[in-house]
Amino acid sequence: MSEGPSALPEGTHTVTVTEVPQLLQLRAGQNEKNKTKKKDTKSKVRWDEKVIDNENMNKKKTKICCIFHPNTPLESDEEEEGECEHDHNHGHDSSSSSSSSSSDEDEGKSFDERRKARLERRRKKLEQKRPPSPNAYEVQPDYSAYRDKNRKDAQ
């Protein structure tokens, strides 16, 4: 029986392998005239009739991403404090509740007084009742009018 295809003699051998770098050549399928002509002609998006027009604003969308809730006027707070038409700060709840929005009357107060007033404004804002709104992904819009229109067109 043999020990394998060939028996190697004992000792060290050095083998030098030189690799020739391979060259990859790319060839254009079009001449230069056609390339510049294609760049000038941009492809335009064509919307299918099934794509939703976002509230008739010519903003086409294929899915829902958010729901707009318009601001509602405050009910009791505005009646108690009164509407102010001129341009100075009365500390209405509609003003920002961030720490950077300090009114002129807060300038003379100490840090603790300003903090207490800011926390009170924040508490009032959080206590305001807001009707719960469904998540956009939980409630789908009613497309029955759109479907009815398509059925009439098909007949």
Swiss-Prot record:
Transmembrane segments: none annotated. Its main location: nucleus. One of its GO terms (molecular function) is protein phosphatase 1 binding. Residues 116-127 have a biased composition (Basic residues). It comes from the Eukaryota. GO terms for cellular component: nucleus. Belongs to the YPI1 family. PANTHER family: E3 UBIQUITIN-PROTEIN LIGASE PPP1R11, E3 UBIQUITIN-PROTEIN LIGASE PPP1R11-RELATED. This is Type 1 phosphatases regulator YPI1.
